[in-house]
Structure formats: structure tokens, C-alpha cells
């Protein structure tokens, strides 16, 4: 029996909340909190007849730590699930520390204003020291490790699919399939079609910033950075087919390089259609992906935030998206002195997700792991104090929960490898 405060009410949060309500014996009470309380009220009203979980709602501006502290003190939760924006990770972590409550999220911290001088100085130092230039990285949240450990609290970082399940797949491979892992390729394929000329499947601002940034991968103990979308490969995905995929920087590479140090190379690939890439490059060329505020008719606006307002809401894509996703990890390494390959992945159907929770599969594949991560913390399966990513915990109960609640794994011991 647990009380959980869930901050966020977008597409991913909606899925996570639906799934929490399917496990009322653990999620006895939940409070849905967002800047827009009306969205929380609407979702609570929809779910109330379907669950015995007691649902309340609240308004909170998660950019303001004092508001989050006040809400936590008023509600007294056992866990705070941060399913808002990565910009708000640190304020919510600060609030959890102030109130003595465990914390979890689905994506690592990045700043909303990348021109802030104080942040910029630290960022530029990290670029030189680490060797990659992505705006998002774990260093900001890892810096909280001692504080959470001394407070006897756990902060679980990145319990979505990628990051999240992909790291659990790596921990599973290390525990059950390999003595040593040599290479890891993380493949994220969305074979869905929503019918729009251009739309993003999750928060447009976060998505477009991620894919327009330089790519990078880990090789032989250091980062290799490349121009955005400059490495392209083809792969034949189970239940989806042949797709073009591009090497991106992705946050789990950073933690996997730390926690599976014998890995000689770790890469992340994501599929994109040509129409998406053409639109993205055009928008970038005209400055619409910029995060720098501009003055327009006497009002300050951020171009990428204005673009977000024009694009379809990812939460609205569910009824019109058809097809499947396929996300997983391909490994090479050794077991009992012999060379070995292994592929573990999940295939998820957009329309089946919509039938169950009114969502497309991108939100579903992030929201279900968020609930399963919370389940691990609330049931005592994962108890290590401090700040940790998913691969640092026992993967078995987490993957079993994913199998049970909608994201079953598939395996191959003779997969096609990604061409070097």
C-alpha cells in the first residue's frame, strides 16, 4: 500500500498513470500534479470508474522548488514520479531531498535555457573533459549521489525505455548471457505512420533538440563525436522490416560506459523517415530549432517552443498511428571462452496501445517502464540508496514486470549485426 505523487500529465505520464491504476494493490493512492490542473482532473475522472486506486489532483509549477516542496509536504507520498520535463529534474530532486522522499524520472537533466552563462561555463568545461557536446548528461544528477545516500533515499534515473529498459537489457545480458561484453548496439525503430507530413512522437522540443545535435558513441575508453545524422545504417527489424537508422548521442551510453567498463564500443541508432529528416533540416536552416529567445512584435519567444505550439500534440497521435516499434540491444562478447552474439528486444503495436490506454506506442513504451520502475522501489525489489541508473539494479524482477504489464521481451542468439 503506497501513496505516489506523479508530476506530469502529458502522453507518457498518462500511460504511466493508467498502468499504476492497473496495480491498485501497490499504487493505493496517487496524486496527479501538473501546471495545468484541468488536464489532471480530466484524466482522474476518466480513470476513477476503472480502478480502486484513490486519485487526487493538484496544481504545481515544477520549475519552482518551493511549490514542489509544499505539495510533497501536503500529500506525504512514498515516492515522487517525475514524468514532467527534463528541465525540471533538479528542482524536483531538491524538493525530494528537502522532504525525505524517494525520486524517479524517465530522462536525464538538460537546461531549458542553454545560453544561461552559469550553466554554459560548466557545460563547456564538460565538453572539453568528456568529449561530447550534447546538452543533456548525467553529471548534474550524479552530483546528488552523496546527498541521497546520506539521506537514506533512492533516486532512480531514466526508467523509460531508452534510457531504462535498454539498460536493464544490458544488465540482463551481463548477468545471464555473457562473461564479458565487447560491443553494445542499441536500436530504436519506430515503424509507425501517423499520416502527418511532420510530427514528433514525444515532446517536440526535447525530440528535435536531441536529433539535431551532434552524434557520439563510446569506443575504446573515450567518446567519438560526429556531425548530426552523418552515420546511417540499414537494419531489418523483426515485425517492422528494413529501415534506415542513424547514429545519435543518447544518455544511456554514458552510464553504460561507466557500469559495463569492459565494453569496447557502445552505440545508439534510431530510425527516421526521409520526410521527417527533410522537414527537420529545413526547420533547422531557418532557425526554428533555436533555443535562443528572439523579439517578435515586442514579445520574447523561443523559436523551438513556438514550433512546438504549431505541431500536433504527441498525445493526440494515438488514434491515427498504425504500425509497430522495435527497440532493443545487440551484444557481442564471450561466454565460457567462446565468442557469442545476443539480441534482446521488444516489439510494440501502436494500435494495441491505443486500445488499452488511448496512446501511441512511443508514449506507451516509456510510460510502462516508468510504472515498473516505481513498482520496483515501492515493493522493495530495488533498495540501494543514492542516485542510480537502471542497469545498477537486478534486471530480473524489472523485466518480469515489463513482460507482465505490456512490454514482453523477445530474444535471438544469432542476430544480424549492425554493419561497422
PLM regions and their residue ranges:
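Rossmann-fold cofactor-recognition segment
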Residues: 50-64
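Conserved Rossmann-fold cofactor-binding substructure of NAD(P)-dependent oxidoreductases
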Residues: 61-77, 88
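N-terminal Rossmann-like NAD(P) cofactor-binding module of classical short-chain dehydrogenase/reductase
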Residues: 72, 78-81, 103-105
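C-terminal catalytic/substrate-binding lobe primarily of soluble NAD(P)-dependent oxidoreductases
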Residues: 175-420
Amino acid at each position: 500500500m503506497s501513496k505516489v505523487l506523479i508530476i506530469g500529465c502529458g502522453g507518457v505520464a498518462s500511460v504511466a498513470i493508467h498502468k499504476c491504476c492497473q496495480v491498485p494493490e501497490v499504487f493505493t493512492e496517487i496524486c496527479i500534479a501538473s501546471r495545468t490542473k484541468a488536464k489532471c482532473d480530466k484524466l482522474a475522472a476518466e480513470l476513477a470508474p476503472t480502478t480502486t486506486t484513490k486519485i487526487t489532483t493538484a496544481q504545481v509549477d515544477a520549475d519552482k522548488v518551493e511549490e514542489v516542496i509544499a505539495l510533497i509536504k501536503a500529500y506525504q507520498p512514498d515516492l515522487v514520479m517525475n514524468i514532467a520535463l527534463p528541465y525540471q529534474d533538479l528542482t524536483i530532486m531538491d524538493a525530494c531531498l528537502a522532504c525525505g522522499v524517494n525520486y524517479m524520472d524517465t530522462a536525464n537533466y538538460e537546461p531549458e535555457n542553454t545560453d544561461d552563462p552559469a550553466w554554459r561555463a560548466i557545460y563547456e568545461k564538460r565538453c572539453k573533459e568528456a568529449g561530447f557536446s550534447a546538452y543533456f548528461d548525467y553529471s548534474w544528477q550524479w552530483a546528488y549521489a552523496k546527498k541521497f545516500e546520506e539521506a537514506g533515499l533512492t533516486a532512480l534515473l531514466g526508467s523509460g525505455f531508452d534510457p531504462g529498459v535498454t539498460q536493464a537489457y544490458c544488465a540482463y545480458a551481463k548477468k545471464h548471457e555473457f562473461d564479458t561484453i565487447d560491443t553494445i548496439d542499441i536500436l530504436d525503430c519506430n515503424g509507425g505512420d501517423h499520416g502527418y507530413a511532420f510530427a514528433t512522437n514525444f515532446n517536440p522540443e526535447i525530440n528535435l533538440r536531441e536529433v539535431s545535435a551532434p552524434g557520439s558513441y563510446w569506443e575504446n575508453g573515450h567518446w567519438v563525436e560526429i556531425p548530426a545524422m552523418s552515420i546511417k545504417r540499414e537494419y531489418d527489424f523483426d515485425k517492422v522490416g528494413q529501415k534506415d537508422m542513424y547514429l545519435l548521442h543518447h544518455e544511456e551510453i554514458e552510464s553504460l560506459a561507466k557500469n559495463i567498463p569492459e565494453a569496447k564500443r557502445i552505440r545508439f541508432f534510431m530510425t527516421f523517415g526521409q520526410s521527417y529528416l527533410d522537414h527537420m533540416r529545413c526547420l533547422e536552416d531557418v532557425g526554428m530549432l533555436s533555443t535562443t529567445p528572439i523579439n517578435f512584435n515586442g514579445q520574447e519567444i523561443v523559436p523551438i517552443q513556438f514550433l512546438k505550439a504549431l505541431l500536433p500534440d504527441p498525445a493526440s497521435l494515438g488514434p491515427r498511428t498504425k504500425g509497430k516499434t522495435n527497440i532493443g540491444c545487440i551484444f557481442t562478447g564471450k561466454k565460457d571462452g567462446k565468442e557469442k552474439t545476443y539480441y534482446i528486444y521488444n516489439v510494440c503495436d501502436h494500435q494495441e496501445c491505443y486500445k488499452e490506454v488511448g496512446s501511441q506506442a512511443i508514449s506507451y513504451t516509456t510510460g510502462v517502464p516508468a510504472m515498473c520502475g516505481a513498482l520496483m522501489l515501492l515493493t522493495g525489489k530495488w533498495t540501494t540508496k543514492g542516485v542510480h541508473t537502471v542497469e545498477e539494479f537486478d534486471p530480473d524482477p524489472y523485466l518480469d514486470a515489463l513482460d507482465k504489464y505490456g512490454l514482453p521481451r523477445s530474444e535471438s542468439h544469432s542476430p544480424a549485426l549492425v554493419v561497422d
